[in-house]
Design a protein with these regions (language model features):
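Extended soluble regions of mature proteins
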Residues: 1-165
């Protein structure tokens, strides 16, 4: 059984993407533009606020081993959208079990690096590590309303800068 430990929100406008993970311990926001080679990470831990700029996408030692469509006898729907199943296996031993819809088309669908080749919008995914630890994310709301560009603006004066790792 998977217990909810937080929420993750995703916003997309044009080539920009913003994801915010909120848990009782921290709030972490990740912002990137697919036309640039960097991303910004903001971490709020208690009263401490940190900002980090990183190369994005990163030079990764992990690569995709296999991508396999999974056919099922049942039809899965999330938020009213028919979903297809896909499994991604990675060289680090992790596995992503993905449910996506091809009924929606966004300019940025890879709000996770692993979604780059998924032919639609991911609405649910479970990451299983090589040590069999599982984390599941599932969309609970989808809003197709226009977004303000200010949503992607950061006031860097509010954060302590940390060096790129």
């Amino acid at each position: 059984m998977l217990l909810p430990i937080g929420t993750k929100e995703v916003w997309v406008k044009g080539y920009q993407c913003k994801t915010t993970l909120t848990t009782p311990q921290l709030v972490q926001t990740f912002l990137f533009n697919t036309q640039l080679d960097k991303a910004t990470i903001i971490k709020d831990i208690g009263q401490s606020h940190f900002l980090q700029t990183i190369k994005y996408p990163p030079v990764s030692k992990i690569s995709l081993l296999a991508q396999e469509a999974i056919t099922t006898d049942t039809s899965t729907h999330i938020l009213g959208y028919r979903c297809k199943a896909l499994q991604l296996k990675w060289t680090d031993g992790s596995v992503y079990d993905i449910l996506y819809t091809d009924e929606l088309s966004l300019t940025v669908n890879q709000f996770e690096l692993g979604f780059k080749n998924v032919p639609g919008l991911v609405l649910s995914y479970t990451i299983t590590s090589a040590k069999d630890m599982r984390v599941k994310y599932q969309a609970t709301k989808l809003d197709l309303s226009p977004l303000s560009l200010s949503l992607f603006t950061i006031n860097s004066e509010l954060y302590q800068a940390i060096d790129e790792e």
